[in-house]
UniProtKB/Swiss-Prot annotation:
Keyword annotations from UniProtKB, A to Z: Cytoplasm, Phosphoprotein, Phosphotransferase system, Sugar transport, Transcription, Transcription regulation, Transport
Protein name as annotated: Phosphocarrier protein HPr
InterPro entries (alphabetical): HPr, HPr-like, HPr-like_sf, PTS_HPr_His_P_site, PTS_HPr_Ser_P_site
Entry similarity comment: Belongs to the HPr family.
Lineage, broadest ranks: Bacteria, Bacillati, Mycoplasmatota, Mollicutes, Mycoplasmataceae
Length: 89
């Protein structure tokens, strides 16, 4: 299992556009990828799961990946979050 934690810095939080980009990126990997925030967790490959979590600015999130390509998935998702300005690099 691989994971990383970060604070959401986007002024509107984890909203529809970046959630869609993250779900698309996560879907490229065979690992199970979970986002955890505010004692809730969701499947990062599902935009609806991510949106239902209503993650706001300043929220600490953890992304976990479990599977054969977990390390690669975590690296790609972290970079995607930086590129979409959800978190700071």
């Amino acid at each position: 299992m691989a994971k990383f934690s970060a604070i959401i810095t986007d002024k509107v939080g984890l909203h529809a556009r970046p959630a869609s980009v993250l779900a698309k990126e996560a879907s490229k990997f065979s690992s199970n990828i979970t986002i955890i925030a505010n004692e809730k967790q969701g499947n990062l490959k599902s935009i609806m799961n991510v949106m239902a979590m209503a993650i706001k600015t300043g929220t600490e999130i953890t992304i976990q990946a479990d599977g054969n390509d977990a390390d690669q998935a975590i690296q790609a998702i972290k970079q995607t979050m930086i590129d979409t300005a959800l978190i700071q690099g």
